[in-house]
Amino acid sequence: MTFPPAPENPFAPRRSLRRTVERLVVVLFRLATYAVVAAGLVVIAQIAVKGADTVFQASFPFINTTFLTQPPESLFVFEYQGTRFEMGDREFRDFRGRLEAEAHAAGDPPPQLEAESYVYAAGGIFPNIVGTILLVIGSMGIALLLGVASAVYLSEYAGQGALVRFIRLAILNLAGVPSIVFGLFGFGLFVVFLGWNVSLLAGWCTLAFMVLPVVITASEEALRAVPRGFREGSLALGATKWQTIRKAVLPYALPGILTSSILGIARVAGETAPIMFTAAYVVRDELPWQVERFTDFFFQGVMALPYHIYVVSSKIPQNAYSERVQYGTAFVFLLIVALIAAASILIRNRLRSRYRW
């Protein structure tokens, strides 16, 4: 028995129209994705091209070792006997002292050098590199310790009451707080109230509190992703709650926890406002390990790459010398963040291949 074909719905959209709309939606989504990627590539390419001129050089050893191994200096540009000179602060003082000594020996008045000075446009960024690495490692260590502990409590021990829901809501709201607010919080609590002054420890704690929401949220999701059967099997064998978490849950959640650390590194390393109030100096003569006592290491300020970029960029008017330092510093800064993130990704992938279910 055959049935007559169903009458066509006059209100239904035509197939050709549906296909056109579907293709249009796909094209729009693709263009949006390409636009985001292109914008990021343009920014990175501009920094890489202009920064490479500062970091690399044409002659051996092909790397500007002065820029990577020396502290920042002011640049002095002047003309002497028809020759144009560009010297850093120390070299300029030595050069001027030598000329004055020669003039004094000859019984002549000292020559007058009319030099234009550009702050922090000479020298290097070695103390800034060291300070940035110390700030990232210390703050992420504190953030992972507190964040994973909080995530374990919320995921494994806490119930579903109103207090727990309020805590989760507060954590989500903290993720949207501007970094300048965290900087003022760290300044008021750690620098003033606790008397730590501008120091590594104050910067570590401030940055750790700032990145805690990201670490807690990602770690809690990683813990929840571990199958419940792992917990039940461990408890059935007589293990305690903590033994179950330590042996049957945390190892399998580590890849997700390291993902949160990668996100945290990207944010911590690039923040300027928090460290400007709590940890960073514009210039400092001593390196972090040049201290008299071990405890002085934690209560000293450091120089940092993002703050150095801010200081150099804020010099008005802008000039070619300062711009060279800006892009060179930004290029090195991106490389450091990329290397730290790449190391975290390698560790995460190794753990992911080791702990599978």
Regions found by a protein language model. Name each.
Residues 139-171, 192, 345-353:
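Transmembrane-helix boundary motif in ABC transporter permease subunits
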Residues 1-33, 345-357:
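Transmembrane alpha-helical segments of polytopic membrane transport and secretion proteins
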Residues 35, 122-153:
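Transmembrane alpha-helix signature in integral membrane proteins
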Residues 171-208:
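Generic hydrophobic transmembrane alpha-helix motif, especially the helices
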